Amino acid sequence: MAGHSKWANIKHRKGAQDALKAKIFNKFSKEIMVAVAKGGSDPNSNPALRLIISKARAKSMPKSNIEKAIAKGEGSTSNGENFKEIIYSGTLSHGISVIVVILTDNINRAIASLQALFRRANGQIGKQNSIPYLFEQKGYLEIEKNNLDEDDLMLFSLDNGAEDFQSDEENYMIYCQPRKISELKNEIEKKFSPNFRAVEISYFPNEWVELDQENTEKILNQIDNFLDDEDIQNVYHNLKFA
């Protein structure tokens, strides 16, 4: 079944590719360190680490960077354990809802920065660790089409725990329950050896808000400002854009 990729509307990233990759890799490194500190350095016995490594590889993070992050996590366990994940909901102008995921070793600094970001965006910060009913958490796999047969991949995915399957001109998009993502990804990898473009557990909106081009660009610039903050890992939103 064909459909528009929801993912393109949820996670917006800047176009300066080199700087962008460096920021993304730094965020992955921090997640890897925390996962190692909590569950050890062996991905086979640490599902959280295994998922993060899959995410990082899907975004072309070099193997050497991943290994360095694992080594840092092993060598500085106390530092890894000091990182805390907190989630804030909030609204920007024009009724755009956001979920902001923070991973920080200084909660007071992170919250102060977040409050300032919402003020500058003329938005309103919500409660900590409260997820609006507008969003649902799902596992998400994005796979390059290449020469993969759509029907074969769709049927195999649905037989192995996928809940939805979509496609656009370049990619297949597969959705599942968060607890199923590692198993589903592994089964697809063994069967098809595809090129994964994304492996994520993410928040997807149940309702979208569509704005004119001028206001869409303003909101996207505000989201960029959030993502520039060193403590902010991800921003999910319900703004629909082309």
Swiss-Prot record:
GO terms for biological process: regulation of DNA-templated transcription. It comes from the Bacteria. Keywords: Cytoplasm, DNA-binding, Transcription, Transcription regulation. One of its GO terms (molecular function) is DNA binding. GO terms for cellular component: cytosol. It is found in: Cytoplasm. Pfam families: TACO1_YebC_N, Transcrip_reg. InterPro entries: Integrase-like_N (IPR017856), TACO1_YebC-like_2nd/3rd_dom (IPR048300), TACO1_YebC_N (IPR049083), Transcrip_reg_TACO1-like (IPR002876), Transcrip_reg_TACO1-like_dom3 (IPR026564), YebC-like (IPR029072). PANTHER family: TRANSCRIPTIONAL REGULATORY PROTEIN YEBC-RELATED, TRANSLATIONAL ACTIVATOR OF CYTOCHROME C OXIDASE 1. NCBIfam families: PRK00110.1, PRK12378.1, YebC/PmpR family DNA-binding transcriptional regulator. Belongs to the TACO1 family. This is Probable transcriptional regulatory protein mhp472. It comes from Mesomycoplasma hyopneumoniae (strain 232) (Mycoplasma hyopneumoniae). The lineage of its organism: Bacteria, Bacillati, Mycoplasmatota, Mycoplasmoidales, Metamycoplasmataceae.
